[in-house]
């Protein structure tokens, strides 16, 4: 699906992961809301090198995924013209991390940016989510980052050993 840029006329920007959800959610929220998709993760560890600062508390060095530059720049433009930006990524550690990365990329304050979650895409569930926002759960973000860092460390260290074993 093509990302079609346009000027945001709505007061609120809601960012979801999946474009399939955006039209239905927009229909439930009405004209004061624009709903756009991030198409999943917008940043990741670099493809070259480890991308983890081991000396600095295993700090991950995230980079914008090349295929997400356009999406992020459009979300940034729309967010800047909205009165409020809402994070509505999936309610799991991946979704929480995606929301946190988006908030950081858009220079939104993670302590005050409304985070909404819903378990079904119904008018009632969406309206309840908007009435009861929370903030990004940094415990879930930390859990996802720990998993991502461990995946990279194990993969980075094991790959050469595995390749040597495969070749012999």
Question: Where do the model's predicted regions map?
Answer:
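Intrinsically disordered, low-complexity regulatory segments
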Residues: 3-164
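Catalytic and ligand-binding motifs that coordinate phosphates/metal ions
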Residues: 166-168
